[in-house]
């Protein structure tokens, strides 16, 4: 029996890649917080859901030219979902995903001496996650995740701070996570589109 789980191996691999990136390139790190103001979501297996999400991103920026940089980082996504009060079989769920981010940013358009326009785009791949669903008449848990996410943002950069308007999309499936509806087992998956404001700090 292996002493290291598959999830632990994925975490170790991601950490090693991030450490390697900091050694090979003269990189800078960025912390980004996302604040959704509008969301469209569909959660397979749930009925007329209420959803609350939060997300935190840590990126390493690797310059490839004066105005272009690659983005290699980590995103932590958390969601809490509940069936509407009118649902005949009420469930609630918690979803957590650890995602690897690969993208690029461009700051070649100067608006003033100190302010530049910033355009960012990235793709996110889940490397691990946990989810649980509780309710009547059944409950389930899962730790295996698959899917993909996309991020696109445009805004301004001033010194070490940037402010973006963003759009992002996620499609996440937790294997073996199910709910029971009218005696039939249904898979649970999260599909969401968000518009919002992003604040980043580079150090």
Residue ranges and their predicted role:
Residues 23-82, 200-202:
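Short glycine/proline- and aromatic-enriched beta-strand/turn motifs that initiate or cap beta-hairpins
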Residues 25-31, 54, 66-70, 98-100, ...:
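Outer-envelope beta-barrel architecture signal
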Residues 29-35, 58, 70-74, 102-104, ...:
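Membrane-embedded beta-strand positions of outer-membrane beta-barrel proteins
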Residues 33-41, 74-80, 106-108, 121-129, ...:
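Transmembrane beta-strands of outer-membrane beta-barrel pores
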Residues 37-50, 75-98, 127-146, 173-190:
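Flexible, solvent-exposed loop segments that connect beta-strands
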Residues 51-57, 97-101, 145-151, 192-196:
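Transmembrane beta-barrel architecture of outer-membrane proteins
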Residues 57-66, 104-112, 158-160, 201-203:
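Outer-membrane beta-barrel proteins
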Residues 83, 150-203:
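Predominantly the C-terminal beta-signal and adjacent terminal strand-loop region
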């Amino acid at each position: 029996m292996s002493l290291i789980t598959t999830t632990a191996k994925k975490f170790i691999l991601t950490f090693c890649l991030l450490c390697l990136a900091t050694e090979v390139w003269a990189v800078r790190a960025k912390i980004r917080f996302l604040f959704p103001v509008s969301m469209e979501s569909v959660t397979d297996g749930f009925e007329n859901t209420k959803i609350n999400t939060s997300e935190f991103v840590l990126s390493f920026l690797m310059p490839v030219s004066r105005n272009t940089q690659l983005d290699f980082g980590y995103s932590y996504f958390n969601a809490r979902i509940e069936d509407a009060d009118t649902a005949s079989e009420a469930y609630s769920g918690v979803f957590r995903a650890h995602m690897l981010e690969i993208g690029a940013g461009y700051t070649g358009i100067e608006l003033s001496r100190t302010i530049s326009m910033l355009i960012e785009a990235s793709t996110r791949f889940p490397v691990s996650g946990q989810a649980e669903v509780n309710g009547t008449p059944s409950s389930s848990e899962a730790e295996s995740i698959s899917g993909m996410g996309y991020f696109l943002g445009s805004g301004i950069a001033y010194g070490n701070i940037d402010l973006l308007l963003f759009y992002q999309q996620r499609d996440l499936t937790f294997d073996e996570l199910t709910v029971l509806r009218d005696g039939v087992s249904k898979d649970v998956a999260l599909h969401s589109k968000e518009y919002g404001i992003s604040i980043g700090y580079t150090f």
